[in-house]
């Protein structure tokens, strides 16, 4: 089983997931990951949800999940029962730039939360209709519908990632702006300019 966070990285850039897999012994969290851990607390996330209008009926935090279907496991930040929306998977991130960013360039974050939702459904038999992406820095909550197309996209992505990594295939590079700040740029594309902070 691979970590759900690897699916998020694969959606962002397949090579990031590949390097996480092959360089696993030397893999270290990035600075934004460490900063996110420092400011994350259940009370903070709960407060953001409530200030966003959530009526939390029941809650569970740091929920271990696994999905045989997806070949993934991990720990969801939270699962809450909300008064009108039902069961929601909560994923906290250091920063979410905007709703538009989340649904375009930040879609990898949605895929991570949706993978946790599918694992929750498989493990516990619940039905999850919504995801809540919580932005810690600006105290905002973004609600995402677990649509049939999102479910299909996550299953397809997990299948594609697992096949690629099981076969040991290095995905082709996709040079772009995100490469400048990637923690694997020195291994993947050593010719990329050495500027920007690591992702």
UniProtKB/Swiss-Prot annotation:
Mg(2+) or Mn(2+) required for ssDNA cleavage activity. Can also utilise Cu(2+). Its EC number is 3.1.12.1. It is an enzyme of class 3 (hydrolase). Keywords: 4Fe-4S, Antiviral defense, Exonuclease, Hydrolase, Iron, Iron-sulfur, Manganese, Metal-binding, Nuclease. GO terms for biological process: defense response to virus; DNA catabolic process. Mn(2+) binds at residues 77, 91-92. Its cofactor is Mg(2+); Mn(2+); Cu(2+); [4Fe-4S] cluster. One of its GO terms (molecular function) is single-stranded DNA 5'-3' DNA exonuclease activity. The keyword Nuclease applies. It catalyses: exonucleolytic cleavage in the 5'- to 3'-direction to yield nucleoside 3'-phosphates. [4Fe-4S] cluster binds at residues 13, 179, 182, 188. NCBIfam families: cas4. CRISPR (clustered regularly interspaced short palindromic repeat) is an adaptive immune system that provides protection against mobile genetic elements (viruses, transposable elements and conjugative plasmids). CRISPR clusters contain sequences complementary to antecedent mobile elements and target invading nucleic acids. CRISPR clusters are transcribed and processed into CRISPR RNA (crRNA). This may be a 5' to 3' ssDNA exonuclease. Belongs to the CRISPR-associated exonuclease Cas4 family. This is CRISPR-associated exonuclease Cas4. It comes from Aeropyrum pernix (strain ATCC 700893 / DSM 11879 / JCM 9820 / NBRC 100138 / K1). The gene is cas4.
């Amino acid at each position: 089983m691979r970590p759900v966070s690897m699916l998020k990285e694969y959606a962002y850039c397949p090579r990031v997931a590949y390097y996480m897999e092959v360089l696993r012994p030397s893999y270290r969290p990035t600075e934004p990951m460490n900063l996110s851990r420092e400011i994350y607390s259940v009370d903070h996330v709960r407060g953001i949800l409530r200030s966003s209008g959530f009526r939390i009926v029941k809650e569970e935090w740091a929920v271990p999940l696994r999905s045989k279907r997806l070949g993934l496991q991990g720990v969801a930040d939270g699962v809450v029962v909300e008064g009108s929306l039902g069961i929601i998977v909560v994923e906290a991130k250091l920063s979410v730039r905007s709703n538009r960013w989340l649904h375009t360039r930040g879609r990898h974050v949605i895929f991570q939360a949706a993978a946790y939702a599918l694992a929750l459904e498989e493990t516990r038999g619940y039905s999850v209709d919504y995801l809540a992406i919580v932005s810690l820095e600006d105290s905002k909550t973004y609600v995402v519908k677990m649509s049939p197309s999102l479910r299909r996209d996550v299953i397809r992505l997990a299948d594609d990632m697992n096949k690629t990594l099981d076969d040991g295939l290095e995905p082709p590079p996709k040079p772009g702006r995100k490469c400048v700040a990637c923690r694997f740029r020195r291994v993947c594309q050593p010719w990329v300019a050495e500027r920007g902070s690591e992702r």
